[in-house]
């Protein structure tokens, strides 16, 4: 019988966390039919035995369990494991779960309600971080974005505005967007899927309750992706989705990050940069930034202005929540509309 919701669980050497993760599947208060689709990606620890132990408990409580996997010498990667778990499942809705995280009992029920209302959206939720003081700024960002910012802040270094371990969507929409990139270690498969979702007009919704205990530890797959890889994808997505709307723009930050963005742009996008802006008097006194690596003659010289003298739209390369509120106050004082007059790329 086809389940209503499939919980998609890729597993690789998850022994320390798997009991707690699978117990949270058993404790869901969703009243529809639910199945668990596990794909064991070449685990070499006791993950397989733990899955078998919980299969009995889950099936006794009415949750059908499908187990796939392989025991090759090395794993095929998170994207592959997720795709396999989706392919072997049957539910009309997909609830993604990482093997080191723990769902709150109401997660499936509340996200399913939202997904029924928003069939072409990715549904996320708020999270509780474990340990509580790890990645405080990032956790605040995940939990406090406004509904509008879920779509306007998709260019930042934080990645998807609802994090992958909280994703819930219809199978039909997943099939329309997916599958995940299977490049393996070092590929930001969640970010690439999220960008493709946005390209296809998908929405982003967050259930404003903390429905997941989101673990931070050194073995997490997130730590395997290079910052330079993510940077390249982000710049290309900015150029594809945002910059075509603007004939000219200002880069807010004449320091390292702003100059790095400028140098990363294509020549066509570089020509749209009319100025850098900043609050640092030393940078402003310099008067301009000269792009020494440019093939153009004369080399481009971009003015550096005080932010009050600069004209929107802005691409902002200043990190949020780091200056004790000074940057945020400056931005607010200009009375601009996010998404229209400025975008964050920090």
Swiss-Prot record:
Assigned GO CC terms: cytoplasm
SUPFAM superfamilies listed in its UniProt record: Nucleotide-diphospho-sugar transferases
Documented EC number(s): 2.4.1.-
Reactions catalysed: queuosine(34) in tRNA(Tyr) + UDP-alpha-D-galactose = O-5''-beta-D-galactosylqueuosine(34) in tRNA(Tyr) + UDP + H(+)
Source species, domain of life: Eukaryota
Keyword Cytoplasm: yes
Record key words, sorted: Cytoplasm, Glycosyltransferase, Transferase
Enzyme class: transferase
Alphabetized InterPro entries for the sequence: Glyco_trans_2-like, Nucleotide-diphossugar_trans
PANTHER family listed in its UniProt record: GLYCOSYLTRANSFERASE, UDP-GLCNAC:BETAGAL BETA-1,3-N-ACETYLGLUCOSAMINYLTRANSFERASE-LIKE PROTEIN 1
Family named by the database record: Belongs to the glycosyltransferase 2 family.
The protein, known as: Queuosine-tRNA galactosyltransferase
Gene that this polypeptide is encoded by: B3GNTL1
């Amino acid at each position: 019988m086809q389940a209503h919701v499939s919980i998609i669980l890729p597993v690789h050497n998850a022994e320390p966390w798997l009991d707690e993760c699978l117990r949270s599947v058993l404790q869901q208060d969703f009243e529809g039919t639910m199945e668990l689709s596990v794909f064991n990606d070449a685990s070499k620890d006791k993950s397989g035995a733990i899955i078998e132990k919980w299969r009995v408990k889950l099936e006794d409580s009415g949750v059908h369990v499908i187990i796939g996997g392989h025991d090759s010498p090395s794993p095929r990667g998170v994207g592959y494991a997720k795709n396999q778990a989706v392919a072997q499942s049957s539910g009309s809705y997909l609830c993604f779960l990482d093997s080191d995280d723990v769902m709150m009992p109401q997660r499936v029920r509340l996200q399913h309600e939202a997904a029924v209302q928003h069939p072409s959206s990715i549904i996320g939720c708020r999270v509780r971080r474990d340990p509580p003081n790890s990645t405080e700024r990032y956790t605040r960002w995940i939990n406090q974005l406004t509904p509008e910012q879920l779509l306007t802040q998709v260019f930042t270094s934080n990645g998807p505005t609802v994090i992958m371990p909280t994703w819930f969507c219809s199978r039909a929409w997943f099939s329309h967007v997916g599958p995940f990139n299977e490049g393996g270690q070092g590929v930001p498969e969640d970010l690439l899927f999220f960008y493709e979702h946005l390209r296809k007009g998908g929405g982003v919704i967050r259930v404003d309750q903390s429905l997941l205990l989101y673990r931070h530890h050194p073995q997490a797959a997130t730590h395997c992706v290079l910052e330079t890889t993510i940077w390249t994808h982000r710049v290309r997505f900015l150029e594809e989705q945002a910059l075509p709307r603007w004939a000219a723009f200002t880069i807010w930050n004449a320091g390292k990050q702003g100059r790095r963005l400028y140098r990363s742009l294509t020549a066509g996008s570089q020509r749209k940069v009319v100025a850098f802006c900043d609050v640092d008097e030393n940078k402003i006194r310099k008067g301009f930034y000269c792009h020494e690596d440019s093939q153009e003659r004369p080399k481009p010289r971009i003015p550096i202005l005080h932010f009050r003298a600069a004209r929107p739209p802005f691409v902002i390369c200043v990190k949020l929540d780091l200056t004790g509120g000074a940057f945020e106050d400056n931005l607010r004082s200009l009375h601009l509309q996010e998404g229209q007059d400025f975008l964050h790329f920090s």
